[in-house]
Amino acid sequence: MRTTFMAKANEVERKWYVVDAEGQTLGRLSTEVASILRGKNKPTFTPHVDTGDHVIIINAEKIHLTGNKLNDKIYYRHTNHPGGLKQRTALEMRTNYPVQMLELAIKGMLPKGRLGRQVSKKLNVYAGAEHPHQAQKPEVYELRG
C-alpha cells in the first residue's frame, strides 16, 4: 500500500519569481500569485506546510481593473475610534497606494491564521520597475492567459 507524500518544512526548495503587473488584471494576477505563494503549482504541495515560492511583483502602479471598478470599487478601513470608518476608491488606491492594493487582493486569497501569515511574508510588491532582490537571481514568471 502506498502512502501520500507529505513535504517537510525544512526540505522544501524555494525559488524566486518576478511578475510584471503592467497591463495585468488585478484578480487574475492575484489568483496566480496566491497559488505560487501557497505552492499549489508544485507536485509536492502539502496543505498544512508552507511549500510555496517567493514572488516579487513590479509595476504595481500599472495594474488594470476591468469595467467601471476604478470609480465604483471602494476599499474600507477602520481606525478603531468611534466614527472612524474611512473609504477610498480603487482609483485613489492605485494612484496613492498601489502596493497596498495588490497586497490586499493577494492576502485575501491566502489562508487565515498562522500559515497564511507565514506565506504572505514571501510576497514583495513594488510600485515601480525596480526591486532590491537581484542577489536572489529571480526568474521571470509568465502568467497563464
Curated annotation (Swiss-Prot):
Instruction: Write down the Pfam families for this protein, in alphabetical order.
Output: Ribosomal_L13 (PF00572)
Q: Which residues form the signal peptide?
A: none
UniProt GO MF annotations: mRNA binding; structural constituent of ribosome
- State the source organism's domain of life: Bacteria
Alphabetical UniProt keywords: Ribonucleoprotein, Ribosomal protein
User: How is this protein annotated for GO cellular component?
Assistant: cytosolic large ribosomal subunit
One GO term under biological process is: translation
Q: What functional role does this protein have?
A: This protein is one of the early assembly proteins of the 50S ribosomal subunit, although it is not seen to bind rRNA by itself. It is important during the early stages of 50S assembly.
Similarity annotation: Belongs to the universal ribosomal protein uL13 family.
Q: How does it assemble?
A: Part of the 50S ribosomal subunit.
The protein in question is named Large ribosomal subunit protein uL13
Q: Name its species.
A: Bacillus cereus (strain G9842)
Lineage, highest ranks first: Bacteria, Bacillati, Bacillota, Bacilli, Bacillales
Q: Which gene encodes it?
A: rplM
